Amino acid sequence: MAFPTAEEITQRVQQIVGPRGLDVEKVDIKKAGAKSAVIIRIDGDQRPDLDVIEELSDEISRNFDAAESDGELNFGAGYRLEVSTPGFDEPLLAARHFRRQRGHIATFVLNQADDEHATANAANARFVARVGALNADETELAVVLPGKKEPSVKTYPLDQIREAKLEVEFSTPPEAEMSLVNTPFDQLG
């Protein structure tokens, strides 16, 4: 039996974290003999704290050990298990990612150039905005664009957003922007 795939690990781990309202965001496998690593990123609408991560890591480890003893999995000569939340540099790709990062600043890359808010270059249309509300069926996202006098809101279908990455923000967000961020999607003008 070969080293388990990322898909096999994702399915197994989702059964453990799902009942806690968490999702498996990413599984990376680095094969290197006895120094192999299985890196699992989990997250939820309520971000798991370190105690929850530790409990889940122990539970996942026990599950993998039992599955290996039963011949269901084979990690070979050994492996290191890492369980954590996604890093700051992970792209926002799904509705749940935007929902969890509401209020944060991100650089957005669109599938095609937009109006004055995006600077089109050879392949990308990019702009910086604050993540706002999603519509009820989570297919459209409102973003809050900083303005010279007042911020404005623009909405995009999620399938028009190729990628969004969070930006580090050291200052307190402007009140006018946060007011728009906290406005429900259906109440935005």
Curated annotation (Swiss-Prot):
Question: What cellular component terms from Gene Ontology apply here?
Answer: cytosol
In its UniProt record, which GO terms are filed under biological process? ribosomal small subunit assembly; translation
Q: Which Gene3D superfamilies match?
A: RimP-like superfamily, N-terminal (3.30.300.70)
Q: What SUPFAM superfamilies does the record tag this protein with?
A: YhbC-like, N-terminal domain
Location relative to the cell: Cytoplasm
Q: What is its main location?
A: cytoplasm
Coiled-coil ranges per UniProt: none
Keyword Cytoplasm among UniProt keywords: yes
Parts of the chain that traverse the membrane: none
Q: Sorted alphabetically, which keywords does the UniProt record give?
A: Cytoplasm, Ribosome biogenesis
Superkingdom of the source species: Bacteria
Q: Which NCBIfam families match?
A: PRK00092.2-2
Q: What does this protein do?
A: Required for maturation of 30S ribosomal subunits.
- PANTHER family named among the record's database cross-references: RIBOSOME MATURATION FACTOR RIMP
Question: What's the family?
Answer: Belongs to the RimP family.
Annotated protein name in UniProt = Ribosome maturation factor RimP
Species: Corynebacterium kroppenstedtii (strain DSM 44385 / JCM 11950 / CIP 105744 / CCUG 35717)
